[in-house]
Amino acid sequence: SAQHVLQNHINAYQQLQTALSQFTVNSPSLSGVTYQSAKAYSSQVLTPLLRASILLDEAIIAACRKLPSEYRSSVDSVDLRESDLVDRIARADRIVGRYQELINIEYQRTKPNWSRIQNLQTARSNQLTVKRKLEEKLHKLRAFHQSSPQIFSQIAGLHSAVQQGIRQSQQSWNASTKTFVLPPKSEMKWAEEVNGKWEERE
């Protein structure tokens, strides 16, 4: 399943995160400009990028779990399509109209059949109930469609952070100086936001 794949991604990111932590914290013997720039690059760019990737996949998993449960609690236990509901409501409305026509015809007779009228009225009432319930489901479905994007609200921001991190990671290596060049602080807002979310997660 998609959730299983995402969880595998998260596990891989966490392993990379552990390796980076060991490189930046537990390798005091490594020195020199290249190693120092690599440590700074790892802690300030790669670590937030891995965190953003983990947070993104976790947000997708959470949204995938929440969407069906929200649908069941807000709309119905079965899958509904708006076009089907609209068609069924229109059909119920036509049936109600037909029953009303038959009732009117019966009333216009010289000797109306009151038993038949009563049966038609009962059938009309039942069909009105069906129509009302279908309209309620349609209203709930449309309300759910309007609110469901909120379930995925965090994903767009995290995806943007991942893209910025990837872009910066691809541009950080300076081949002429053989060092990693950190982006200016003004371009690291994504990392600050990710680190803040990471602290909330922990």
Residue ranges and their predicted role:
Residues 1-202:
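Intrinsically disordered, low-complexity charged segments of secreted bacterial virulence
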